[in-house]
Amino acid sequence: MNDLRYPIGQFTYKRPITEEMIDTWIQEIEDLPNELTKAIKDLDQKQLDTPYRVGGWTVRQVVHHVVDSHMNSYIRFKLALTEKNPTIKPYKEEKWAELPDSKLPVDVSLVMLESLHKRWVNLLYSLELEDLEKTFNHPETGETKLAAAIGLYAWHGRHHTAHITSLRKRLNW
């Protein structure tokens, strides 16, 4: 049986990272707002409040989490581009998912995601090759190059979209 936590598998990538890989990943980041919107299309409130797996987040929490995560990533990119290997601040995503704003209508986060991704994609397309080598330091996972972070967040968007689409498929929604 597939691991419901990782419907598209865990994040991996081939080395070295090529310009073609970067372009594909940026396109996936650019496409995410539309893909996530399609994934939740026509879901009612009960469906939005259904966990994608036992013990997992609800569809609503997943949508809000994607925005929380990608806002943090956008800031991490800006820090890495303006400071030398900055140490970023991790956050407790499971606790953020329990805050009151995670119960808001999903449209609130979809609008934020659309705007955020327009800015982020603009920034990503402006990067030079040397910018892709810049890094940030995560206190728990260590140093990350921006090139790899682009891939990670492209995967992250597809990963959470697949949580929703696989739930829909399993429950025939």
UniProtKB/Swiss-Prot annotation:
Zn(2+) binds at residues 65, 156, 160. SUPFAM superfamilies: DinB/YfiT-like putative metalloenzymes. It is an enzyme of class 3 (hydrolase). GO terms for cellular component: cytoplasm. GO terms for molecular function: hydrolase activity; zinc ion binding. Its EC number is 3.-.-.-. It holds the Pfam family DinB_2. Binds 1 zinc ion per subunit. Keywords: Cytoplasm, Hydrolase, Metal-binding, Zinc. It is found in: Cytoplasm. It comes from the Bacteria. The keyword Repressor does not apply. Signal peptide: none annotated. Its cofactor is Zn(2+). Possible metal-dependent hydrolase. Homodimer. Belongs to the metal hydrolase YfiT family. This is Putative metal-dependent hydrolase BCA_2790.
